[in-house]
Amino acid sequence: MNRRELLIGAALTPMARWIGPGPVAAAQSASNSAQMFRRTRPSDPQWPSAASWNRLNEQTDGHLMAVKSPLAACQDSPSGPACRDVFKGLKNPYYIGDDPALTQTTGYLDAWASQPSAYAVAARKTGDVVAAVNFARDNNLRLVVRGGGHSYLGTSSAPDSLMIWTRAMRDITLHDSFIPQGCLDPPQPAVTIGAGAIWMHVYNEVMTRGGRYVQGGGCGTVGVAGLVQGGGFGSYSKNYGTAAASLLEAEIVTADGVVRIANARSNPDLFWALRGGGGGTFGVVTRMTLRTHALPEHLRLRLHDHQSGVSGVIPPPRERIRGSLRRPPAQPSLGRDRQHQAGPYA
């Protein structure tokens, strides 16, 4: 038993179990508790066999993948062309978002000792999430969930874990009149968002196409599901509250592999917990429905337009704003990182 196991066991063992039996028995109890919560790793004999992983791949329609960090190229040859390409890509948040081995916190969270998840299920539908949750539970694997990859605690990825990567689950549906399942509330405008959508996609759909506003975050590459579950303070929070306050309903897969609907009437405790309790804490969210608001008449716009390898005369601010708003949302091939942040006009 090492010091880590003793500390974990101490935290997980009720205080009453430490009273009476003496230090030897208490230490053994702590060790047992630590072993109970220890996840299976590749070096353990209980690690799933190749046949087991193949079955999971079949259950998810071929969406299981082994996760390999592109930073491995820098460990082999720090000055080689492959490593230079990786560093060039790391300047672009879209490059990071499209690789399950990277997160938006890679630069300052164990960057040079990157240990991504062992495998990832690139989920396309709720059934893929159910299969991954059941597989992780049955095999005692650590499970992580990655949407936008902005977890500042590094929980978007973990070594020797199974990742549920929701990037492809980004359908967005606008509702003129939405009523949560089983509720008697009057209908209201809303938007249903897949767990893998980022705010840039949502703002484009809701504001540009729908003429409405949805309370979200100021950074366009942040994932919707993670921000809402973390509370979600944004540009208009003084007017509309947090992103979590706009949540009307969520579909979530809990640890028992059951798909549940959470709203004010159905599973209200779970609904309460999802609004700020932390991403992936109570299950894996597959979609969310958020309240939308009337689009404000006046906006204050802050524009970040970073370009790599681009030279020439910088145009005046007004032309830069007009040109940026006319361009497509993402131009990763040009090394461009652009963010629009809107706030109350004052």
Residue positions per predicted region:
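N-terminal secretory signal peptides and thylakoid transit peptides that target proteins
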Residues: 1-14
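Glycine-rich N-terminal segment of FAD-binding domains in flavoprotein oxidoreductases
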Residues: 76-81, 121-169
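Glycine-rich, histidine-containing beta strand-loop boundary motifs that form or position
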Residues: 10, 68, 123-124, 145-149, ...
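C-terminal cap/substrate-recognition region of VAO/PCMH-type FAD-linked oxidoreductases
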Residues: 42-46, 198, 212, 241, ...
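N-terminal glycine-rich flavin-associated loop
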Residues: 109-139, 168-217, 233, 237-263, ...
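Surface-exposed loop and adjacent secondary-structure segments within mature catalytic domains
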Residues: 153-183, 222, 226-230
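C-terminal segment of N-terminal export signals and the immediately downstream linker at the start
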Residues: 1, 18-57
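Conserved oxyanion/phosphate-binding beta-strand-loop segments in alpha/beta enzyme cores
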Residues: 59-110
